[in-house]
From Swiss-Prot:
GO terms for biological process: propionate metabolic process, methylcitrate cycle. It comes from Aspergillus oryzae (strain ATCC 42149 / RIB 40) (Yellow koji mold). Pathway: Secondary metabolite biosynthesis. Keywords: Lyase. 2-methylcitrate dehydratase-like protein; part of the gene cluster that mediates the biosynthesis of oryzines, natural products with an unusual maleidride backbone. The two subunits of the fungal fatty acid synthase oryfasA and oryfasB probably form octenoic acid. This fatty acid is most likely activated by the acyl-CoA ligase oryP to give octenyl-CoA before the citrate synthase-like protein oryE catalyzes condensation with oxaloacetate to form tricarboxylic acid. Gene3D superfamilies: 2-methylcitrate dehydratase PrpD. One of its GO terms (molecular function) is 2 iron, 2 sulfur cluster binding. Signal peptide: none annotated. NCBIfam families: prpD. Belongs to the PrpD family. Its EC number is 4.2.1.-. This is 2-methylcitrate dehydratase-like protein oryR. Pfam families: MmgE_PrpD_C (PF19305), MmgE_PrpD_N (PF03972). The keyword Iron-sulfur does not apply.
Amino acid sequence: MTIPAADDNNCPSYDKVIDLIVDYAYDYEIDSPAAWTRAKAALIDALGAAIESIHTSPECAAMIGPVWPQTATVPGGFRLPGTQFQVDALKGAFDLGGMIRYLDHNDAFPGAEWGHPSDNLGAILSTADILSREALARGSPEEVISMKQVLTALIKAYEIQGVFQIRNAFNKVGLDHVILVKVASSAMVSWLMGLSRDQARAVVSHAWADGHPLRVYRQAPNAGPRKGWAAGDACMRAVHLANLVRCGQPGIRSAITTPRWGFYDVLYRGQTFELPRPFTSWVMETVLFKVSTAEGHGLTAVEAALTIAEKLAQRGLRPEEDIVNIRARTQEAGMIIINKKGPLHNAADRDHCLRYMVAVVLLKGSQITTADYQDSSPWARDPRVETLRSITTMEEDPSFTRDYHDPQCRSVANALEVTLRDGTKLEELVPFPLGHVRRPETLQLVREKAQQNLGLKLSSERVGQILDTVDQPKFEKMAASDFVDLFIPQPASSAA
C-alpha cells in the first residue's frame, strides 16, 4: 500500500496575481483626463440604468429593499437611489448592483470574456455612502469618502475586470463573468474601507476561493432573470468578504495556485491567467456605453436593421410580407451569446436574441426599447416577429472576430443582408456601435440617456442639479453621502 506523502504546510506568499491586483488598487496614480471624464459619464449612466430598471421592471422592483422582516430604514445605512429605502451594506450592494445590470442597459467591455464593468458601482457606491454617513455621525467630516475616491475606485475596478477579460475566457470553463466583479470590487472596497494592504490581499484571496456562479443562467435553454441580479450578488459578496477580513479573518495565500485545491486546478482546468497589459486606466478610456437597449454584441445589428427598415419604408414595403430571408454575419461572441432559435420565455431571453432584436426593429421601423423585451410588450406575442425570426440565419464572420479582439480596432461588427421577394438584396454593415469610443457623439448620447432615465423617478429640476453637480470642479470633493442624497425622490414622488 502506498502511503501518501505529508503535505507541505509551510506558509506560502500570496499568489502573484493577488499582489498585482492589490498593488494596483493601492498605488497607481490615475493621470488620464479621458479616464476622469469618462468615469463621470459611467457614473451617471449606471445610476440612470439603475433607476430605469426599477421603473420598468416589476421583477427588479420587487427584489430591492429590506430583507423581511426588517424595516425600510436602517439608521446609517445606504440610501438606495430612486427609492426611499435605507438598507444595510450587504443589501445595498446587492440592490444597486442588480438595479444597474437588470435590463442589460449598462456599459460593456468585450474580450475573450464578456462583462459589464459598471456592475462594480453597486459595491463601491454603497460602501462609500455608508462610510461617509458613519464618519459624519461620529463627528469626523474629514474622514468622509469623496467623490474623487469613488471615481478612483470605479476606474480601477473597471481596469481590473477589463484587463482580465481580454484574454481569460471564464465562459470556456462554464463560469460566469461576475467572478471578475467580485474580485475587482473586493480590491476597491478594501481600499475604500482603509484596510491594510495585507488585509486587502486577504479579501481578494477569498474572492478567488469562492465557488463561482455557473454561466448556465445566461445561455439557452436556461437564460433568465438571474443574469440581471448576478452582478448584485457579486457586489454583495465582495462587501461581505471585506467586512469579514475587517473583523480579523485571515486570507488564503495561495487560493489560486495551490495544486489540486486552488482555483487553477479546481475551476480553470489547469490553465493560468494571462494579463496582456499592465493595469492603468485603459478600460475606462475605451469601455462601450450602451446608448440603445440591446445586448452589446447585437448593437450594430440593431443599427443595421434601422437603416434597412428606412429603405423598406421608402419603397412602401412590409417586412413580414416582402422579406424572404435575413442573413446576419456576426462575431464569435455573438454566435455564442445571442444566437437562439425556438420559443423565448422571458425578457432576459428576448434581450439575448439577435433574431428578436432585428425582427422588432424591422417591424417597428424605430429603435428597440427596454419595454419591447418585456412579457407585456405586444412584440413578445406578435406572430410577425416569429415569422422574421424563422427566416433569419446567423454565421460567424472571421474578420469580425479578428477585429473584435484586435486591441487597435475593438470593433463589434454586424452585417445584415435582407433578401426581398423580387430578389433584391439590401445590405448594411456597421462596425462600431453608438457608444463606442470611436463614435464622437458617444458622451453626449450617454448624457441624454442618463437625463431621460433619471427623470423616470426624479424631477427635472433634480436631474438638472445632478448633471450640473457632476460637471463642477468641486464635484470631486463632494461627500459620497451628499451625492447619493441627490438621487432620493422628493416625498411627493412614490418610492419604488
